[in-house]
């Protein structure tokens, strides 16, 4: 029996911290599906298609990773339909855990067969958040140590595009 997990997130952009959590999940599960949440409530820098392209590029070396988009609906329903036994969540700090713990309880209520697995990234990524990466990059800071080169190119292009508009 294949042990499958889903790893949901906005991934705006996908960072080395996300990649680290994914690699840790692959040590536990046979297959991990990265699920991009469209999340209309969040203001994103990149479109869903741009984020999908970046994640595909970063994970293409892994034969046991797939990528999909959750356009609408409940994550618990998506997990059930995908045949996943677990939802992987990266937790960098206590405040992440508090929110994720509440969500895991709700998901367990909706889909008792699924387990939420909390994974901590390598300590060098504990302060790396997509929000910080976006802000630093858009201000011209060097984020090359925190994202894949393909993602860095996309961030630089987005910054150049914004600078051209002002």
Swiss-Prot record:
Pathway: Cofactor biosynthesis; coenzyme A biosynthesis; CoA from (R)-pantothenate: step 4/5. It comes from the Bacteria. It catalyses: (R)-4'-phosphopantetheine + ATP + H(+) = 3'-dephospho-CoA + diphosphate. Disulfide bonds: none annotated. The keyword Cytoplasm applies. Its main location: cytoplasm. InterPro entries: Cyt_trans-like, PPAT, Rossmann-like_a/b/a_fold. ATP binds at residues 10-11, 18, 90-92, 100, 125-131. The record marks 18 as: Transition state stabilizer. Homohexamer. This is Phosphopantetheine adenylyltransferase. It comes from Chlorobaculum parvum (strain DSM 263 / NCIMB 8327).
């Amino acid at each position: 029996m294949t042990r499958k997990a889903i790893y949901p997130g906005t991934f705006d952009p996908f960072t080395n911290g996300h990649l680290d959590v994914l690699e840790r999940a692959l040590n536990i599960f046979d297959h991990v599906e990265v699920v991009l949440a469209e999340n209309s409530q969040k203001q994103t820098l990149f479109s869903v298609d741009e984020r999908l392209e970046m994640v595909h590029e970063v994970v293409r070396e892994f034969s046991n990773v797939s990528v999909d988009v959750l356009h609408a609906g409940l994550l618990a329903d998506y997990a059930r339909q995908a045949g996943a036994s677990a939802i992987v969540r990266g937790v960098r700090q206590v405040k992440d855990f508090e929110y994720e713990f509440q969500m895991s309880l709700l998901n367990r209520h909706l889909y008792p067969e699924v387990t939420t697995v909390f994974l901590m990234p390598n300590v060098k990524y504990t302060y790396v958040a997509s929000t910080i990466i976006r802000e630093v990059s858009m201000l011209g800071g060097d984020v090359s140590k925190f994202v894949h080169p393909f993602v860095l190119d996309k961030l630089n292009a987005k910054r150049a595009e914004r600078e051209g508009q002002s």
